[in-house]
């Protein structure tokens, strides 16, 4: 009985998410953010003339540039 209880306790601890982490979209797939990263962002930038580049992911603070979006819920930056 003790073994069963101990096994159940170990499985519970392993499967339990001990801290909430934000999930954000990246250009290809999803990204689980680090605990300190509290925001998702989506930003369009022009590295070269007439060639927009989309950047997406987790961030510590919201970008302030033009054509950027910042949010703080799971998968909100699609």
Curated annotation (Swiss-Prot):
Disulfide cross-links:
24-40, 33-58, 62-70, 71-76
Q: Provide the site residues for: Key residue for inhibition of muscle alpha-1-beta-1-delta-epsilon (CHRNA1-CHRNB1-CHRND-CHRNE) and important for inhibition of neuronal alpha-3-beta-2/CHRNA3-CHRNB2 nAChR.
A: 46
Instruction: Look up the record and report any one GO term of the cellular component aspect.
Output: extracellular region
Q: Where in the cell is it found?
A: Secreted
The feature of type site (Key residue for inhibition of muscle alpha-1-beta-1-delta-epsilon (CHRNA1-CHRNB1-CHRND-CHRNE) nAChR) is located at: 44
Q: Does the keyword Disulfide bond apply?
A: yes
Tissue-level expression = Expressed by the venom gland.
Keyword Glycosyltransferase belongs to the record: no
Q: In this UniProt entry, which residues are annotated as the site Important residue for inhibition of muscle alpha-1-beta-1-delta-epsilon (CHRNA1-CHRNB1-CHRND-CHRNE) nAChR?
A: 45, 47
- Where is the signal peptide, in residue numbers? 1-21
Q: Name one GO molecular function term.
A: toxin activity
Keywords of this protein's UniProt record, alphabetized? Acetylcholine receptor inhibiting toxin, Disulfide bond, Ion channel impairing toxin, Neurotoxin, Postsynaptic neurotoxin, Secreted, Signal, Toxin
Residues the record annotates as the site (Important residue for interaction with muscle alpha-1-beta-1-delta-epsilon (CHRNA1-CHRNB1-CHRND-CHRNE) and neuronal alpha-3-beta-2/CHRNA3-CHRNB2 nAChR) are 67
Residue numbers marked as site, Important residue for inhibition of muscle alpha-1-beta-1-delta-epsilon (CHRNA1-CHRNB1-CHRND-CHRNE) and neuronal alpha-3-beta-2/CHRNA3-CHRNB2 nAChR: 28, 43, 51, 66
- Residues under site feature: Key residue for inhibition of muscle alpha-1-beta-1-delta-epsilon (CHRNA1-CHRNB1-CHRND-CHRNE) and important residue for inhibition of neuronal alpha-3-beta-2/CHRNA3-CHRNB2 nAChR: 48
What family is it from?
Answer: Belongs to the three-finger toxin family. Short-chain subfamily.
State the protein's purpose: This three-finger toxin binds and inhibits the nicotinic acetylcholine receptor (nAChR).
The protein's name in its UniProt record: Short neurotoxin OH-5
List the taxonomic lineage.
Eukaryota, Metazoa, Chordata, Craniata, Vertebrata
């Amino acid at each position: 009985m003790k073994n069963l209880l101990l096994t159940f306790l170990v499985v519970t601890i392993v499967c339990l998410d001990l801290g909430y982490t934000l999930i954000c979209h990246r250009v290809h797939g999803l990204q689980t953010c680090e605990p300190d990263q509290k925001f998702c962002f989506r930003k369009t930038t022009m590295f070269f003339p007439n060639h927009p580049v989309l950047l997406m992911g987790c961030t510590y603070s919201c970008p302030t540039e033009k054509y950027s979006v910042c949010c703080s819920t799971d998968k909100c930056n699609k």
